[in-house]
From Swiss-Prot:
Protein origin, superkingdom: Bacteria
Ribosomal protein keyword on record: yes
Identification of the protein by name: Small ribosomal subunit protein uS2
Gene3D superfamilies per UniProt: Glucose-6-phosphate isomerase like protein, domain 1, Helix hairpin bin
Keyword terms: Ribonucleoprotein, Ribosomal protein
Entry's Gene Ontology BP terms: translation
InterPro entries associated with the record: Ribosomal_uS2 (IPR001865), Ribosomal_uS2_bac/mit/plastid (IPR005706), Ribosomal_uS2_CS (IPR018130), Ribosomal_uS2_flav_dom_sf (IPR023591)
Keyword Ribonucleoprotein among UniProt keywords: yes
Family statement: Belongs to the universal ribosomal protein uS2 family.
Any Pfam family matching the protein: Ribosomal_S2
Organism (species): Prochlorococcus marinus (strain MIT 9211)
Length: 238
């Protein structure tokens, strides 16, 4: 049984690529045709890649690998958090801070600081500080929650990075490759398939396409960890 059907992908708009002038020739193997100046992705090949990606991700989860979902653009942000939380993965959905992977010692210290501030807030310790100091601490807390809130459960570097929009997340790609962390990547027609281990050619701009693909990958992680193979992911946000 296919992990994702052609009709599901068509309905989600997963076949729409970028304008032909914005393409990466390395994606030609995944392109079906050009229509009205826009490349159309071959969804038969996407389905094949998605089946492979599902099995690869499921096996990685079954062997205890830890996952990091990355997608910071507006239309992906909410989906990234939703699906990462559903499968117990960490996530970055606001902004990739330089060194999130390659300077992990410093990043881990910032995450620990976030946890300390959250404990202080919940215990009332911040409220007991002078007004100005409390304001500064709360501002720091809000900023850390915004950018690092999805990493609180990440005690060490991830084993796999799941990526939305390779072009936008260039720094994440470079850091992962520098550390030999494999990438499971949604690839639009302007991307480079050579920069990831597990390619999924599809529209990485449409919300419903992102929902569908990340939802299935979250299903794969849950199946690998818990043995459940019910496809619940990729549902539309309310």
């Amino acid at each position: 049984m296919a992990v994702v059907t052609l009709s599901e992908m068509m309905e989600a708009g997963a076949h729409f690529g970028h304008q032909t002038r914005r393409w990466n020739p390395k994606m030609s193997r995944y392109i079906y045709c050009a229509r009205n100046g826009v490349h159309i992705i071959d969804l038969v090949k996407t389905a094949v890649c998605m089946n492979s990606a599902y099995k690869w991700t499921r096996n990685a989860a079954k062997s205890g690998k830890r996952f990091l979902f990355v997608g910071t653009k507006k239309q992906a942000s909410e989906v990234v958090a939703l699906e990462a939380n559903r499968c117990g993965a960490s996530y970055v959905n606001q902004r990739w801070l330089g060194g999130m992977l390659t300077n992990w010692t410093t990043m881990k210290a910032r995450i620990d600081r976030l946890k300390d501030l959250e404990r202080m807030e919940s215990s009332g310790a911040i409220a007991m500080r002078p007004k100005k100091e409390a304001s500064v601490l709360r501002h720091e807390l809000e900023r850390l929650q915004k950018y690092l809130g999805g990493l609180k459960g990440m005690k060490r570097l991830p084993d796999v990075v799941v990526l939305v929009d390779q072009r936008r997340e260039t720094n994440a790609v470079l850091e992962a490759r520098k550390l030999d962390i494999p990438l499971v990547s949604m690839l639009d027609t302007n991307c480079d398939p050579d920069l990831c281990e597990v390619p999924i050619p599809c529209n990485d701009d449409a919300v419903r396409s992102v929902q569908l693909i990340l939802g299935r990958l979250a299903d794969a992680i849950n199946e690998g960890r818990h043995g459940s193979n019910e496809h619940r992911g990729g549902q539309r946000l309310k």
